[in-house]
Amino acid sequence: MLGLLLFGGVWTAMLVHDAERRYPATGSFVRAGEARLHVLDRGSGPAIVLVHGAFGGAADWDPTVIDALAARHRVLAFDRPGHGHSDALERCDGDPREQARVLIEAWRALGVQRPTVAGFSYGATVALAIALEARDDVGALVTINGAIHSWGGTPEPAYDLAAVPALGWVFTHTWATPLASLVAPTSVRRAFAPLDVPSTFDRSPVALAIRPRNFAANAADIDALDPFLREQERRYRELALPLVVVVAEGDLVTTPSIHSHALASEVPGAELVSVPGAGHQLPYTHASVVVDAIERAVERGRR
């Protein structure tokens, strides 16, 4: 047993070293409460905040979405707390409201007021939490293949194990990263299906996301997600701001009928943007659709 743990620990150290060597931080850092967040801050004009999904990072928006938006807007793409190059929160229990609070503090520290907030996948959960908990701090909202409603999900054993005191630390620092690296290609293909994985896919968020501390943060996020959504979904009718809901009809990760279509029908005045034949990873495969949706939300928020 000790030999297996040592082998896993060495393998983990090699994967972490390679990921950090190949994918250093390319943005700046901002202090928000107890955390230091990594942010890609580009352009000028009406502000847009981009919130990435699970096992992702700010680089998921870069360069296509960020560059297109930065031509006319100030764009802030954060690594969420505990993800990418950002610090984890002291209390890592997966509550999206805590991430929402820290992101608001971060953009305020950068002099931004009432941005349009766009969230992809799990990032939409956080974006909705921002809009519900701090309505006056958001100009408009965009969800992109969002995790929005409870779907009756059951916890993954690996994520549960990562949360166990002491034993979870051993798991995340020995075998979690190697095992995640082996299943990552299958997960990536599913995220792009029914389309192929494009050559432009930036693998840096995945490589960084399976490092021990990042794996633990992702595990906490995903483990807490379905119970949290059972509470948050009761409040969606409270949303009283411009909302654009972007959905890929072929998404295998966040089922369109459960998540995006349901939200669009619940919120008066919501605009639904449907993308036939596309999969979950719209920021990569249909960046122009994502950019257009965000820009329309910005304009609606300024009226």
Which residues does each PLM region occupy?
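Active-site loop/oxyanion-hole signature of alpha/beta-hydrolase fold enzymes
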Residues: 40-42, 77-118
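Catalytic active-site module of serine/aspartate enzymes centered on a nucleophile-bearing elbow/loop
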Residues: 268-303
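Conserved HGGG/HGGXW glycine-rich cap/lid loop of the alpha/beta-hydrolase fold
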Residues: 42-85
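Acidic catalytic loop of the alpha/beta-hydrolase fold
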Residues: 224, 250-254
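Conserved alpha/beta-hydrolase catalytic His-Asp/Glu region
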Residues: 18, 153-158, 176-238
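Alpha/beta-hydrolase fold catalytic core
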Residues: 1-47, 71-73, 112-113, 299-303
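Flexible "cap/lid" loop of the alpha/beta hydrolase fold
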Residues: 132, 142-173
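Short beta-strand/loop motif that positions the catalytic acidic residue
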Residues: 239, 245-247
